[in-house]
Amino acid sequence: MSKLNAYFGEYGGQFVPQILVPALDQLEQEFIKAQADESFKQEFKELLQEYAGRPTALTKTRNIVKNTKTTLYLKREDLLHGGAHKTNQVLGQALLAKRMGKKEIIAETGAGQHGVATALACALLDLKCRVYMGAKDVERQSPNVFRMKLMGAEVIPVHSGSATLKDACNEALRDWSANYSKAHYLLGTAAGPHPFPTIVREFQRMIGEETKQQILAKEGRLPDAVIACVGGGSNAIGMFADFIDEKNVKLIGVEPAGKGIETGEHGAPLKHGKTGIFFGMKAPLMQNSDGQIEESYSISAGLDFPSVGPQHAHLLAIGRAEYASATDDEALDAFKLLCKKEGIIPALESSHALAHALKLAYEDPNKEQLLVVNLSGRGDKDIFTVHDILKEKGEI
């Protein structure tokens, strides 16, 4: 039986109740077979092209870094059906579930984007769908909750703990433990127990593959850096995967610094966490001195996650990727600027990556550099949040 590597350096693994091991083993074997099956790959490719709208554009910005020598491109995952990069890997996993004969899909969601993507894939592929969502996030993201329901998904609010994403993850795993024979757990990020981090990366890697082809066609060279926001880390690993072996391309992940790292209200476990076991994996975690999981915080529900995918932890440990952070205010400024200067409303998640790119462009305006930001999603879901914050600040 061929096996994928369960670890990235010291990170990853499979820390789950024994009852789930057969389900994870089955998933791993089916994934290995599917990756070698031309008809599976063709069906996935067709869905991505005909249904989701790939390849997505690589857009050169016109105004936002006009007074610098930086050339800035945006990889437009916001243009994907469903509004974010989430759709890519969800279609892949849903096809895998069908291949395994599973009729039901269980998912967790924070911002609601993964829930929406899962709901649309289940509607398309005729699978029963239930989505666990922290009760707080249900309030924060009502448009996405309604979208899921419109597409036939059952949305289950989770009131335990902090009533956010980590609690939804726990409930989803609990459900799967009871129902794994008929249900597939469609995990929403490149984290969790093996083989999920690998599967999600492989079903997102077209982001970086397309970017590489597109930038070579437009600029005749590879970028100096690719930049992506990091919550669980799937959009970032999708962008990074095809560039890992290109040693001259910097890989920069941007975590949410929330109200400031020093306040403790942030979601930056890579740079400011401790290694522990959470959500079925060994990874950096936000923990207090007793080793309890700390609440993460970010203006953006999709980055509000107290851990991170194991491959990111490994890339940091070996020095191949670097990880910065952006505060709520910096992300908000980048959000407003992209709206005003380019006519694109980005997701608050993606705005963190953009904020760091702008920092790089403006800290040395005379530096010639070619940067690509993964614009991982569109900001329609965030306009009410932003409206309320700007109103509070007296800006509108």
UniProtKB/Swiss-Prot annotation:
Instruction: Alphabetically list the UniProt keywords.
Output: Amino-acid biosynthesis, Aromatic amino acid biosynthesis, Lyase, Pyridoxal phosphate, Tryptophan biosynthesis
Q: Cellular component per GO?
A: cytoplasm
* One GO MF term: tryptophan synthase activity
- N6-(pyridoxal phosphate)lysine PTM positions read K86
> Which pairs of Cys residues are joined through disulfide bonds in the record?
none
Q: Which reaction does it catalyse?
A: (1S,2R)-1-C-(indol-3-yl)glycerol 3-phosphate + L-serine = D-glyceraldehyde 3-phosphate + L-tryptophan + H2O
Matching CDD domains:
Trp-synth_B (cd06446)
InterPro entries, per the entry: Trp_synth_b_CS, Trp_synth_beta, Trp_synth_beta/beta-like, TrpB-like_PALP, TrpB-like_PALP_sf
Family matches, as Pfam families: PALP
Q: Describe which pathway this protein belongs to, using the record's wording.
A: Amino-acid biosynthesis; L-tryptophan biosynthesis; L-tryptophan from chorismate: step 5/5
Q: What Enzyme Commission number(s) apply to this enzyme?
A: 4.2.1.20
UniProt cofactor(s)? pyridoxal 5'-phosphate
Query: Where in this chain does the entry annotate a coiled-coil region?
Result: none
Per the record, the similarity remark reads: Belongs to the TrpB family.
Q: What does this protein do?
A: The beta subunit is responsible for the synthesis of L-tryptophan from indole and L-serine.
The record's note on quaternary structure and interaction partners says: Tetramer of two alpha and two beta chains.
> Cross-referenced NCBIfam families, in alphabetical order?
trpB
What name goes with this protein?
Tryptophan synthase beta chain
